[in-house]
Amino acid sequence: MKEISGIKVKVESGSKYTTDHGFYAVKDGIRNKKENAVHVRKPDWLKVQKQDSKEYLKVKSITKKHKLSTVCEEARCPNINECWSHGTATIMLMGSVCTRACKFCSVDTGNPKGWLDKDEPMNAAESVKLMGLEYVVLTSVDRDDLEDGGAGHYAATITAIKNLDENIKVEALTPDFAGINENIDKIINTKVDVIAQNIETVERLTHPVRDPRAGYWQTLNFLKYVKQKSPNVLTKTSIMVGLGETDEEIYKTMDDARSVGVDIITLGQYMQPTKHHLSVERFVTPQQFEEYRKVGLEKGFLEVASGPMVRSSYRADRVFKRNNLDL
């Protein structure tokens, strides 16, 4: 169900609709493609328990009241019940419609034509305060329709949070801002603690999986630039597995990430969000995810979060506490 002008309307996955702001978008980001309609039975280790706790309902209420999107909802994250039940959420900035259409992602796609909510930075900061978060993850849709890709708006949100409480740790999982350094600088020049940009998959599968405007080395060069400009900021990336890659390609991707100074990497199982998206090619066992973690630590990452249900922002605060990283 999509809420449009205060009315709940059923919008079919893969179909076009008009947003409250007057522009067209595609539900779940990918048009109806029958050739992708392959259903693969999930193994038992991927089954999730629903937990509509008081904390879950509190987080839902706060984000709705402040007109905020969350990647938890828009990207159909399998961990939404667990995370929200623990009072944490990943806030998705600049609306719920992305200008890019990656073939794994269920976020709606379209052209927002420059629309932005000018109150969002303060609304996000107030929501973080109401949730009592000590560590917050911000992410956003890609906004190629904006001159700076939305970097200024993103930076204003980080600053608003830090102005409310400078002790709150902020992780910014950002777009690539088209690889333009002046845009990346806007994020670096805030008091952000962690900057993440997801590589998503191995080099060979980048264009079959990601939007053509994204790039394997564009992501790596983004992270390299961040580390060169601000060595004390932790850098992070994430890989999905199960899209047709080999373990050798995963290890090569780890090497490439380490070569540009990436500190933290996460690995999780790709799960097809709708029948229109890329099919799952394999389900990786929990034991193999443990092996990925072992290899990653041996390669020099400060931390490796690896497991079937791991997503880039999953338990982000606990990742750092576990290894006592100096935030």
Curated annotation (Swiss-Prot):
Subcellular location as annotated: Cytoplasm
Keyword Magnesium: no
Reactions catalysed, as given in the entry: [[Fe-S] cluster scaffold protein carrying a second [4Fe-4S](2+) cluster] + N(6)-octanoyl-L-lysyl-[protein] + 2 oxidized [2Fe-2S]-[ferredoxin] + 2 S-adenosyl-L-methionine + 4 H(+) = [[Fe-S] cluster scaffold protein] + N(6)-[(R)-dihydrolipoyl]-L-lysyl-[protein] + 4 Fe(3+) + 2 hydrogen sulfide + 2 5'-deoxyadenosine + 2 L-methionine + 2 reduced [2Fe-2S]-[ferredoxin]
Cofactor(s), names only, from the UniProt record: [4Fe-4S] cluster
EC number in record: 2.8.1.8
Keyword list, A-Z: 4Fe-4S, Cytoplasm, Iron, Iron-sulfur, Metal-binding, S-adenosyl-L-methionine, Transferase
SMART domains the UniProt entry points to: Elp3
InterPro entries according to UniProt: Aldolase_TIM, Elp3/MiaA/NifB-like_rSAM, LIAS_N, Lipoyl_synth, rSAM
One GO cellular component term: cytoplasm
Co-factor: note: Binds 2 [4Fe-4S] clusters per subunit. One cluster is coordinated with 3 cysteines and an exchangeable S-adenosyl-L-methionine.
Pathway: Protein modification; protein lipoylation via endogenous pathway; protein N(6)-(lipoyl)lysine from octanoyl-[acyl-carrier-protein]: step 2/2
Family annotation (SUPFAM superfamilies): Radical SAM enzymes
NCBIfam families in alphabetical order: lipA (TIGR00510), PRK05481.1 (NF004019), PRK12928.1 (NF009544)
Family of this protein: Belongs to the radical SAM superfamily. Lipoyl synthase family.
Listed name of the protein: Lipoyl synthase
